[in-house]
Amino acid sequence: MEDAPAFYGFKNIFLTMFATFFFFKLLIKVFLALLTHFYIVKGNRKEAARIAEEIYGGLSDCWADRSPLHEAAAQGRLLALKTLIAQGINVNLVTINRVSSLHEACLGGHVACAKALLENGAHVNAQTVHGATPLFNACCSGSAACVNVLLEFGAKAQLEIYLASPIHEAVKRGHRECMEILLTKDVNIEQEVPQLGTPLYVACTYQRVDCVKKLLELGASVDHGQWLDTPLHAAVRQSSVEVINLLTVYGANLNLRNAQGKSALDLAVPKSSVRQALLLHEGPPALSQLCRLCVRKCLGRTCHHAIYALGLPESLEKFLLYQ
């Protein structure tokens, strides 16, 4: 029993040391976080990244380096954003992943914030470490207003083939209006991106019927997909009868084979509605259909405009335009 006081004394000393160590470690983390923020505000991104690496162990999406301007842009707080800009904060501050405040504003669809940033010198074509631009983010959110503002300030509508493609993102999300705006800026409707294919192929993969229809109307190649895989292959995999019917009406070739040597019909489940839809179009097309396809092919991508200049009867115009 005489050893009991000594035991409790050692226990209290141990607990005190443990609590002191824990508090000291917490204090260091708080200090480093404040130091990180200081370096971000001063614009020393390299040092901020090094400190964040020590604190967070190299997490790929660290939110600790988001400036107040990032927060204001992401939440659409225009007054706060303008106040920060007036105080002299750099509008082109980026996070460790190269995300700018303009990226945040466009991802949130906050067009007023995006415009304010652009008017104060924000880089319109800034890229994140993943190659995403503010225009890509605007297409992701489906903000046609942001897309228009970015294009007015010189945003590149079409980037290099290996960067994140705005039109593919718009189609993937089903944002037809954003897609149409980009196409008016001479974006290549046949642009094939590795792992994604053409915009039409993406639309078929994600069953974006409105986008499929509009792309076909605007002259997208009905058989150009992802390498040897056609849009029809993608539609069959998704069991989308509506998309299959659209593609076949626009002249999709049922006999084309992919890298595995399979046609769209080979991929269809036996006795399914998809297979029945394909079989309905397996025979030779009508002469009127062949003529329509031939005329549209000769006129090219601008056929939807050129047809009106031919001086044809209204009924024939509507037939050629699939109306």
UniProtKB/Swiss-Prot annotation:
Residues 273-323 form the SOCS box domain. GO terms for biological process: endoplasmic reticulum unfolded protein response; proteasome-mediated ubiquitin-dependent protein catabolic process; protein K11-linked ubiquitination; protein ubiquitination. InterPro entries: Ankyrin-SOCS_box_domain, Ankyrin_rpt, Ankyrin_rpt-contain_sf, SOCS_box, SOCS_box-like_dom_sf. It is found in: Endoplasmic reticulum. Pfam families: Ank (PF00023), Ank_2 (PF12796), SOCS_box (PF07525). Pathway: Protein modification; protein ubiquitination. SUPFAM superfamilies: Ankyrin repeat, SOCS box-like. GO terms for cellular component: Cul5-RING ubiquitin ligase complex; endoplasmic reticulum. PROSITE patterns: ANK_REP_REGION, ANK_REPEAT, SOCS. GO terms for molecular function: ubiquitin-like ligase-substrate adaptor activity. ANK repeats lie at residues 64-93, 97-126, 130-159, 162-191, 195-224, 227-256, 260-289. Keywords: ANK repeat, Endoplasmic reticulum, Repeat, Ubl conjugation pathway. Its main location: endoplasmic reticulum. Gene3D superfamilies: Ankyrin repeat-containing domain, SOCS box. Substrate-recognition component of the ECS(ASB11) complex, composed of ASB11, CUL5, ELOB, ELOC and RNF7/RBX2. Substrate-recognition component of a cullin-5-RING E3 ubiquitin-protein ligase complex (ECS complex, also named CRL5 complex), which mediates the ubiquitination and subsequent proteasomal degradation of target proteins, such as BIK, DIRAS2 and RPN1. The ECS(ASB11) complex acts as a regulator of the endoplasmic reticulum unfolded protein response by mediating ubiquitination and degradation of BIK. Belongs to the ankyrin SOCS box (ASB) family. PANTHER family: ANKYRIN REPEAT AND SOCS BOX PROTEIN 11, SOWAH (DROSOPHILA) HOMOLOG. This is Ankyrin repeat and SOCS box protein 11. It comes from Mus musculus. The lineage of its organism: Eukaryota, Metazoa, Chordata, Craniata, Vertebrata. The gene is Asb11.
